[in-house]
UniProtKB/Swiss-Prot annotation:
InterPro entries: AAA+_ATPase (IPR003593), Chromosome_initiator_DnaA (IPR001957), Chromosome_initiator_DnaA-like (IPR020591), Chromosome_initiator_DnaA_CS (IPR018312), DnaA_C (IPR013159), DnaA_dom (IPR013317), P-loop_NTPase (IPR027417), Trp_repressor/repl_initiator (IPR010921). This is Chromosomal replication initiator protein DnaA. Residues 359-478 are annotated as: Domain IV, binds dsDNA. Residues 1-95 are annotated as: Domain I, interacts with DnaA modulators. ATP binds at G186, G188, K189, T190. The gene is dnaA. HAMAP family: DnaA_bact. Keywords: ATP-binding, Cytoplasm, DNA replication, DNA-binding, Lipid-binding, Nucleotide-binding. The keyword DNA-binding applies. It is found in: Cytoplasm. Pfam families: Bac_DnaA (PF00308), Bac_DnaA_C (PF08299). One of its GO terms (molecular function) is ATP binding.
Length: 478
C-alpha cells in the first residue's frame, strides 16, 4: 500500500478540481458520495450503489477524473471503480433470481438441466482460488471499463447470453467453460466480453484477465515468431485465468495461428481456466477451422444473441437518453426503434444524430426532426455499402487521394479526413473492427479511437457535423 498518500485527501482534492470542470451538480454530488482507498499503485473509488457509480459510465467524467488524479499524484498509476460489495451482492442476486425464474419456464436445449442454470453467485465456497496474491503484477487486461453488466440492456434476445456471462465471471473455469457467444455484428457480443472482465476483476482482484480480438492474438503470435520469443508468448497466454477472444472467425484459414490457439485453449481448459469466445457464426458453421477446434468450442455452452426485439430496442434508446440527459417522447423512440431492427450500434447512432441536429438548430426533438434524420440516414436501406467506396468518397470530398486515408501521414487535414472515413465506415456498414483495421492498415483500436473522437466532435463542432451530414447523404444516395 502507498503509505505516503492519504486516499481521503487525494479524493477531496480531485473532486474540488473537477468542480471547475463540470457544471452539473449531479456529477459532483455523485462523486462526493464515493469512498476512496489505495491498493498498491491504484486508487480504488467505491460508490454506495450502482446508480451512483453510473456517473463513471460517462467517458468524459471517467477520463477527467483519471487525468486529474494521475496528473496530481504520479505514484498512482490507475483508478478502479467499484461498488460496495454488500449492495452489489443484493442488487445482482435479486436480478439473477428473477432471470433464473424466467428461464425455468422455458426450454433451453443448450443447457445441461442436471446442473443449476445459475449458481449461487455469492457462495464464497464456490469461488475458485487462483494463484498470485494481491501484489502480483497483472498484464494489461485489454478490458474496457465502460462496458459493464449494469449498462447492458437485457431483453429476450440476449438474456441467456448475459446470464451465462455473469455465471462465467462469478465462477471462472467451473461454469460454462468454454462460453461461446455468437450473433450478428452490433448485437452486444463485445459488450458482454468486456463486462465479464470488469465483473470478474471486481470479484477477484488478483485474477489475471485478458481480452483480445482475434487480430490481437494473431499479431502477438506473428511478432513472437519474428522476434524469437515464442516461449514468452506461450507463457503470456497460458498463465491467464480468464481469456476472452473476440471475433474468432477471423482465425479461419490461418493454420499456424489456429495451431497455437488450439494448444493455448487446451492448456487453459485443462487447468480449469475460463475461456470466453465470440463469433458471428456458431461453431458448426465456422469454415476454415479443423474439426478438433470446432469440437473444443462446443464442449461448453454455446449461446446466441438474436437481433433485439422492438421492446429491447426501445429500452436501449431509453438508456441512451438517460445517459445523455435528454428527454424524448415514447412515440419518437418507438418510431426510431421500428426503423432499425438489426444493429444496436446503428440504433444508438441514429439517436445521437438526432440529438446533434436538434442542438445545432436549437430546436426541440420532435417527430418531424426524427423523420428527417432517419430519412437522410436511409433507415432500413436494403443495399450494402462498401467501406472502400466510403474511403473514396471521403477522400474526394477533402480533395485527397484514397491512398492518403489508408497511409501513414499525420498531417492534420489528412488525419481528420481519415478519422471521419473510419467513423462513417463504422456507422454505415456492418464490417467488423478487425476487417476495418485491415482496410485502413491499422489496428482495430485505432478505429475505436477515431469513432469516439468524431462522435465527440459532432456534438461540439459545426463544421464536423456538417461534413458528416453531407458525406452521409452523398454515400446513401450514390
Amino acid at each position: 500500500m502507498n503509505k505516503t498518500l492519504n486516499p481521503q485527501e487525494v479524493w477531496i482534492k480531485a473532486v474540488r478540481n473537477l468542480e471547475g470542470f463540470f457544471s452539473s451538480p449531479r456529477v459532483i454530488g455523485y462523486l462526493k458520495k464515493a469512498s476512496p482507498s489505495i491498493e498498491g499503485e491504484s486508487l480504488i473509488i467505491t460508490f454506495p450503489n450502482s446508480h451512483l457509480a453510473s456517473v463513471m459510465d460517462d467517458i468524459e467524467v471517467y477520463d477527467a477524473t483519471k487525468k486529474t488524479i494521475l496528473d496530481s499524484y504520479p505514484s498512482i498509476k490507475e483508478i478502479k471503480i467499484t461498488i460496495s460489495p454488500d449492495v452489489l451482492e443484493k442488487e445482482i442476486t435479486e436480478e439473477i433470481n428473477d432471470l433464473v425464474q424466467s428461464m425455468e419456464e422455458e426450454d433451453f436445449a443448450l443447457i445441461d438441466h442436471t446442473k443449476p442454470v445459475i449458481p449461487n453467485f455469492f457462495d464464497q465456497n464456490t469461488r475458485v482460488n487462483f494463484g498470485g496474491g494481491p501484489n502480483n503484477h497483472h498484464p494489461t487486461t485489454g478490458v474496457n471499463p465502460r462496458f459493464t453488466f449494469d449498462n447492458f440492456v437485457v431483453g429476450k434476445s440476449n438474456e441467456l447470453a448475459r446470464a451465462a456471462s455473469i455465471s462465467a465471471a462469478e465462477r471462472p473455469g467451473k461454469s460454462f467453460n468454454p462460453l461461446f457467444i455468437y450473433g450478428d455484428s452490433g448485437v452486444g457480443k463485445t459488450h458482454l466480453l468486456h463486462s465479464i472482465g470488469n465483473y470478474a476483476k471486481f470479484l477477484f482482484p488478483s485474477l489475471r484477465i485478458k481480452y483480445v480480438s482475434s487480430e490481437d492474438f494473431t499479431n502477438d503470435f506473428i511478432n513472437s515468431i519474428s522476434s524469437g520469443t515464442s516461449q514468452k508468448f506461450q507463457e503470456k497466454y497460458r498463465q491467464i485465468d480468464i481469456l476472452m477472444v473476440d471475433d474468432i472467425q477471423f482465425l479461419q484459414k490461418k493454420q499456424e495461428t489456429q495451431e497455437s490457439f488450439f494448444h493455448t485453449f487446451n492448456s487453459l481448459h485443462n487447468s480449469s481456466r475460463q475461456l470466453v469466445i465470440s463469433s458471428d457464426l456458431p461453431p458448426k458453421q465456422l469454415m476454415g477451422f479443423e474439426d478438433r477446434m470446432r469440437s473444443r468450442f462446443e464442449c461448453g455452452l454455446v449461446c446466441d444473441i438474436q437481433k433485439p426485439d422492438l421492446e429491447t430496442r426501445i429500452a436501449i434508446l431509453q438508456k441512451k437518453c438517460q445517459n445523455e440527459k435528454k428527454e424524448v417522447s415514447m412515440e419518437i423512440l418507438t418510431y426510431i426503434a421500428s426503423c432499425f431492427s438489426s444493429s444496436v450500434r446503428e440504433l444508438e447512432g441514429a439517436l445521437l444524430r438526432i440529438f446533434a441536429l436538434a442542438s445545432f438548430n436549437k430546436e426541440e426533438i420532435n417527430m418531424t426532426l426524427a423523420q428527417k434524420v432517419l430519412e437522410d440516414l436511409g433507415a432500413q436501406r436494403g443495399d450494402k455499402i462498401d467501406p472502400i467506396e466510403i474511403i473514396e468518397i471521403t477522400a474526394k470530398h477533402y480533395d485527397l487521394a484514397a491512398s492518403d486515408l489508408c497511409g501513414n501521414s499525420r498531417v492534420a487535414n489528412i488525419s481528420i479526413a481519415r478519422q471521419i472515413a473510419m467513423y462513417l465506415c463504422r456507422e454505415l456498414t456492418d464490417v467488423s473492427l478487425p476487417k476495418l483495421g485491415y482496410i485502413f492498415g491499422r489496428d482495430h483500436s485505432t478505429i475505436i479511437y477515431a469513432t469516439r473522437r468524431i462522435s465527440d466532435l459532432i456534438g461540439k463542432d459545426r463544421k464536423t457535423f456538417s461534413d458528416i451530414y453531407k458525406l452521409t447523404q452523398f454515400i446513401l444516395r450514390r
